[in-house]
Amino acid sequence: MSNPLVYCLPDGYTMRPRDFAADPWQYQLVIHRGFDNDGTPEKWDDELLKRIPHANDALKTFAIANREYCAHCGLWYTTGDTAYVEPVATVPEHRKRGLAKAVVYEACSRAHALGAKRAIVLSDQAFYSRIGFTLSSEVYDWEHANSD
């Protein structure tokens, strides 16, 4: 993250400012719809969201159009060198416009300003390599085989 992360939002979209108080229902909808869920979700307990350890609302980025949250990047960072990107979602009708890249770049830039030197994502989706992430390590899931 040593080079500036540059993105361009399409006309009609804005990026959520750092001091913006996110609307919990809009936040829930962008996650629900961005992961291709149908229907209307059951409302989350807003108080529960406030108690998530290490949550930093200034690092939650949203691309917004007409007061609707269209794309989101969550990012976890406390101290040290590493920020963790998770989750990233774009509402289907707003895809293919560069919004996911924009929210990821904005979130990473905010973490960099706080001291993060790198950002990682635990995903091998091609999207992340297209926007500049490179493989730094691999994770293996080991399971014990039953001898039954």
What residues fall within each predicted segment?
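Conserved acetyl-CoA-binding loop-helix of GNAT-fold acetyltransferases
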Residues: E86, T90-P92, K96-A113, V121, ...
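Short acidic/polar active-site loop segments enriched in Thr and Asp
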Residues: D81, K117, T134
